[in-house]
A protein has these predicted regions:
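Glycine-rich beta-strand-centered segment in the early N-terminal region that forms part
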Residues: 22-39, 51-97
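NAD(P)H dinucleotide-binding glycine-rich loop of Rossmann-like/cofactor-binding domains
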Residues: 65, 78, 90-152
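Short glycine/proline-centered loop/turn elements that form peptide/ligand docking sites
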Residues: 75, 80-84, 174-183, 220-221
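Short, well-ordered loop/turn sites that connect or cap secondary structure elements
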Residues: 85-86, 142, 230
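Mid-domain Rossmann-like dinucleotide-binding core that forms the NAD(H)/NADP(H) cofactor-binding site
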Residues: 130-195
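Short amphipathic alpha-helix with an adjacent loop that forms part of the alpha/beta core around
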Residues: 198-208
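Glycine-rich phosphate-binding loop and adjacent beta-alpha segment
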Residues: 220-281, 314
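C-terminal hydrophobic helical "lid"/dimerization subdomain
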Residues: 270-314
Length: 314
């Protein structure tokens, strides 16, 4: 038996409950993984919150999409993107629907080796945010020597995007709240406080102009400023401003004509693992909660200023 978190109905974090259920025996192309840590992402509560539609048939809804752990059982022909999988392998899993669980059976195609340089908590928070960061950097085509502005640079996606870009020789300017400016600076970016006067502070930090933008905040101010700074809206990408697609900016994660980036995201783990091995990226874990505290984790993350990744410990 495994413990897992489900949403009993659509609503806020109060609809979550911790239950016990059997763990399916892995079939062909599947493995079972014992969770060591579980990544928490805004999409987790948006799904049971109804932001992406409501289907009563989906209830009770398993929650979560990524985890790190140890392979405990292997089905026939279970081969991940890095090769055949074996019992005892230390892995990162994404996508892993229902990841808020002590043990989970998943497609082998979702399972990648855990970089030994990362803790369980760090590995649990790497793949979804990291895939989004790689996806965003790829669609705007930012390259060495260019200047990149990241709105919301202190969050899980923003911090990873900043580190990856810096490792690739890109100059990064990142907006953040006052309490998170040092965290952004720590990873080689120029930190700029958001709020009144943001336009002037960004122009001062980038006297030569801004070539591309990643928006992780979704605010109207962020998109309006980005359109003012960057002549080509196709070099602006947002992971939240889904209602601004008519401006010509690129969207990932939702909205009309969003870029799915299926191949980019599926292959992103290789770049992320390589950068982790080289010491070029870290996963900043802002806070951990127990599996039973998933609702509290969601309330904290929904406040909008986590300062890194939120992780559950089974």
């Amino acid at each position: 038996m495994a413990k897992r978190v489900v949403a009993d109905s659509y609503g806020g974090p109060e609809v979550l409950s911790l239950i016990e259920s059997d763990v399916p025996v892995p079939g062909p192309g599947e493995v079972t993984v014992r969770a060591m840590a579980i990544g928490v992402n805004p999409v987790d509560y948006k799904l049971y919150g109804g932001a992406m539609g409501a289907d009563p048939a989906a209830l009770p809804m398993p929650v979560g999409l990524e985890l790190s752990g140890v392979v405990t059982a292997v089905g026939r022909d279970a081969e991940g993107p890095a090769g055949p999988l074996s019992v005892g392998d230390e892995v990162m899993v994404h996508p892993a629907p229902g990841a808020y669980a002590t043990e989970l059976t998943v497609p082998a195609s979702s399972v990648a080796p855990k970089p030994p340089e990362l803790s369980w908590e760090e590995a649990a928070g790497l793949r979804l945010a990291g895939a989004t960061a790689v996806h965003a950097l790829t669609v705007i085509g930012v390259s060495e020597g260019e200047t990149l502005l990241i709105h919301g640079a202190s969050g899980g996606v923003g911090l990873l995007a900043a580190q990856i870009a810096v490792a690739d020789g890109v100059r990064v300017i990142g907006t953040a709240g006052e309490s998170h400016l040092d965290s952004v600076e720590r990873y080689g970016a120029t930190a700029v406080r958001y709020g009144e006067g943001l336009r002037e502070r960004v122009r001062e930090a980038a006297p030569g102009g801004v070539d591309a933008v990643i928006d992780t905040s979704g605010t109207r101010e962020a998109i309006d400023l980005s359109l003012e700074l960057v002549p080509d809206p196709g070099r602006i990408v947002s992971i939240l401003a889904f209602d601004r697609g008519d401006t010509g900016i690129k969207l990932i994660g939702g909205g009309p004509n969003a870029d799915p980036g299926t191949e980019i995201r599926a292959g992103s783990w290789r770049k992320l693992a390589e950068l982790a091995h080289q010491g070029e990226i870290e996963v900043v874990v802002a806070r951990t909660y127990s599996l039973a505290e998933a609702a509290d984790a969601h309330r904290f993350l929904a406040e909008g200023h986590p300062g890194g990744k939120v992780v559950l410990l089974p």
